[in-house]
C-alpha cells in the first residue's frame, strides 16, 4: 500500500515540474504590459526578464500583452529578447520608448501591435536583429535623433516597415523588409538620414521620402515592390546612389515636385513604367546609371527643368529619354541611348534643351519631336554634337564651316531632325568621356571601341577595338593644364602622324590620328573578328613637377 502511494506521489511531482516552463513563458500583468522603471526595477516582478546589473535586461520567456508590450523608462539600457516573443492583440506598441537616450533593443520577436517598436523624442538608440512582423506598422521614430535601425527582419506589417517622422541623423541599414503594405522605409519631414544596404522586396512601395531634406538612399536592393522603387516627393537635396532597382510595378525612381536631387550609379532594370521619372521637378542630376529594359521610358521628364541627364547607359527600354509638357532648359549629354524599342529621344512641347555628346545607336526611331519643340543638338565646333548610327555623311573637311581640307571627327553636313531641329556637327564616331587627374576630363571621338583608359600624369594610354582590316580614327580632346608641350602619338610602339586641330588653345588641345585594325594585333581570343590596339599618347611636360625645371622665357 505504501509503495503504491509513493509511486503516485512521484508521478505527480514529475508532472508538476514539467509544467513550470509553461507557466513562465507567457506572462500577463496589468494588462500584460511590462515596465523597466527609471530606477532599474522590473514591473511586475514576475515578468520573464532578468537583469544582474540594471543595464542589460534579458527575456527569459514570451510576453503576451493587451496594450503596450514592454515600456522602457530608463536610459542607458539594453533589452535582449534572446529570441523570445512579445505578442500583442493589435493595439499599443510592442516596445515603447519616449524621451529615452542610449537604449538598445535586440534579438526580439515582436508581433501583432499597432507598432512593433515606437520611439518618440529618443536618441542614440540601436534596434538590431529583431523580427518585427504582422503589426499595423513595423518600427516608427518620431522626433528622434542619432538612432540606428539595422539588421532587422521586418515583414508583413500592414503599413510601412520602418517610418521616420520629423527625425534627424538616423541610420537605417541592412534590414530585410518584405511584404509590408506600405513602403519598406518611409521618411516624412526628416533630415540628414541614411537609408542603406536594405533588402526591400514585395512591399507596397520601396523607399519613400516626403518633405525631406539632405537624406542619402544608397546600396539598397529594391525589387518587385507594388509601387515605385524609390519616391522623392516635395523633397530637396537628397541623394539616390548605388541601388539595385528592378522589377517594381511602377517607376524605378520617381521624383515629384522636388529639387536638387541626385540619382547616380544605380542599376535600374525591368520596372513596369519608367526607369526614372521627374515630375514638376528642377535642378536635379541623373548620372552614371545603368537603365535597361524598363517598359516605358528609361528616363522621363514631365514639366521639369534645369536638370542634367548625363553619362547614363539607356538601352532596350520602351523608349530612351522623353521630355514632355514644358520640360525646358535641361541638359542631356554623354549618354549611350541604344536599341530602345521606340524613339531614342522624344520631345513633346519642350524646348531650349541642350542635347549633345550622346551616342544614339540603333533606336527604332532616333528622335521624335513635336512641332512646338525647338532644341539645341550640338555644342558648337570643335566640341560637336551627337553620334548617330544612321548618319550617312562624310568627313573630308574640317573647321567651323567644314570647308577646309582634312578630317576632324565631325561630319561635313548636318544631321537633320526636322525644320526646327538639327545637329550641325554630328560626330563620326562614338563619344567617350574619361576622368583624368585633378578633375580634368579627356574626351574621345572614335570609330573603335575604347577601353582600358589610363592616364599617369605624363601619358595617356587606351585600347581601341575595331573590325578586322578596317581603318580606325580617334580624336582626343585634352585639357592643356596637366598636359602641355610637344605630343607624340604611338600605335603599337610605332609613332604615327597626327593633326593638331587649329582650334586648339591654351585650355584645350584637339588631336586627330588614324590607324589600321590588323589581325596581327589580335590579343583577345573571345573577339576573333576584332583587335586591340594599344594607343599611347605621350606629352613632353615642361613643368617643375616633372622635370624640376621650367622652359626659358623669351623677352
Question: Which sequence ranges carry the predicted segments?
Answer:
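Extracellular beta-strand-rich solenoid/capping regions of secreted or surface-exposed proteins
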Residues: 51, 64-79, 87-104, 112-122
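Short, charged juxtamembrane terminal tails flanking transmembrane helices
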Residues: 550-555
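Solvent-exposed beta-hairpin/edge-strand motifs
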Residues: 77-80, 477-495
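A cross-kingdom C-terminal cell-surface attachment/processing module
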Residues: 529-549
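Thr-biased low-complexity repeat/linker tracts and other Thr-enriched repetitive architectures
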Residues: 124, 128-351
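Functionally critical loop-and-helix segments that line ligand-binding/catalytic clefts
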Residues: 19-56, 84-85, 124-125, 129, ...
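N-terminal extracellular ligand-recognition/capping segment immediately after the signal peptide
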Residues: 39-43, 53-77, 83-87, 372, ...
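Surface-exposed beta-strand/loop patches in extracellular or lumenal glycoproteins
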Residues: 67-73, 368-369, 465-485
